[in-house]
Amino acid sequence: MLFISCDKSYTSSIPDYPVQLDLNLTTTYPTFKNSYNKALTFEKKINVNDFIGYGGILVYTGFDGGYYAFDMSCPYEAKPKILVHPNGNGQAVCDSCKTIFDISYGIGNPTGRHRPNLPDTTALANQTLKRYKATFSGDILSIRR
């Protein structure tokens, strides 16, 4: 069985950095295989041959069962150390500007801001999260730019 998540051309404030990450979903991440609304984050290389983009890689299984990958850098902040993290609700939230990105179906659109008890919840980011190609074949989920 082969699943491919395609990436269309778009302009991003996140620079192009090398991306190469292979995850064995049978031996290393067995609970991630065939799951829904689960996330893995990689802020550091696992192996010497890995490349994790500009700010790290967020790998996500969508509500539709698809595999998706995003750069963890917030496109509004555009700095490698200001990251988004999954919140368990099909969203990723920027640690700094608090913009919420909808990752539930692999798009990464900004939808608002997490600001409890504050009136302004307008998203600061006007770009989607930078997406990477996620290809699943056999037991291996491959992430590439």
Regions found by a protein language model. Give the residues of each.
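Cysteine-rich micro-motifs
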Residues: G90-K98
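Short, surface-exposed, charge-dense and proline/glycine-enriched linear segments
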Residues: K45-N47, P116, T121
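Sec-dependent bacterial lipoprotein signal peptides
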Residues: M1-C6
